Regions:
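A glycine/threonine-rich phosphate-anchoring loop and its flanking beta-alpha core
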Residues: 1-40, 166
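C-terminal charged capping/lid subdomain of soluble metabolic enzymes
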Residues: 19-22, 116-193
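Short, surface-exposed linear patches
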Residues: 21-23, 29, 78, 100, ...
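Intrinsically disordered or highly flexible coil/loop and linker segments, enriched in small
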Residues: 27, 31, 61-64, 68, ...
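Active-site segments that bind and position negatively charged phosphate/pyrophosphate groups
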Residues: 37-143
């Protein structure tokens, strides 16, 4: 990764990329620690070059372990994407990376609310997300996004929502939620201040 290329990007594109970087930091505990410990350096080009290289290596390891997407290991790369894609299709005003961050935020609430993640882990994930997305906005009529989540290419169900959630440090799983329950979680986004 050439840092000179990064210097040509507008701030919004850097934020979009931070969405994927932070997702990787949630999946790779050591990278997450590195991001939290070096938060003031997140816009330093040499640090970003180092982080992007770390992310590329992580993704390459995951893809190498599940090249044909047959074992399910690769599903971890979908973290935040089920909800992120649904919001992106429903509202469209933000970048893909911003929606992935918001999707991770809500899916983190789901993981905690459904008993898969402890509050300490959810707090850590929210701390990582806040490095790029300081305030999760309100989304009027967010429950309308349910239909987009059902149609998402990452969702393999027609009667429920499947998503990959983070349970703890570098550990996650795919879960399935009934549509009504997922809509209740989406409603949380309607009430954000």
């Amino acid at each position: 990764c050439d840092p000179r290329f990064l210097s040509t990007l507008p701030a919004r594109e850097i934020k979009c990329g931070l969405g994927e970087i932070i997702k990787t930091g949630v999946l790779d505990g050591a990278l997450g620690d590195k991001l939290l410990q070096n938060a003031p350096r997140l816009h330093d080009l040499s640090f970003l070059q180092e982080i992007v290289s770390d992310c590329i290596r992580f993704k390459a390891r995951v893809v190498e372990q599940d090249e044909m997407e047959s074992s399910g290991i690769r599903k971890c790369l979908n973290l935040g994407h089920t909800t992120g894609h649904a919001l992106e299709l429903c509202y469209g005003r933000r970048s893909h990376g911003e929606y992935v961050l918001i999707g991770m935020w809500l899916e983190c609430l789901i993981a905690e609310g459904e008993g898969y993640a402890k509050k300490e882990h959810s707090d850590r994930v929210r701390s990582l997300i806040s490095l790029a997305e300081r305030r999760i906005p309100s989304f009027p009529d967010a429950r309308q996004c349910l239909r987009y989540a059902l149609l998402d290419k990452k969702n393999d169900r027609v009667d429920a929502i499947s998503m990959y959630i983070s349970e703890s440090y570098a550990k996650g799983r795919e879960i399935t939620l009934p549509c009504e329950k997922y809509a209740d979680y989406l409603a949380i986004l309607e009430k954000r201040q």
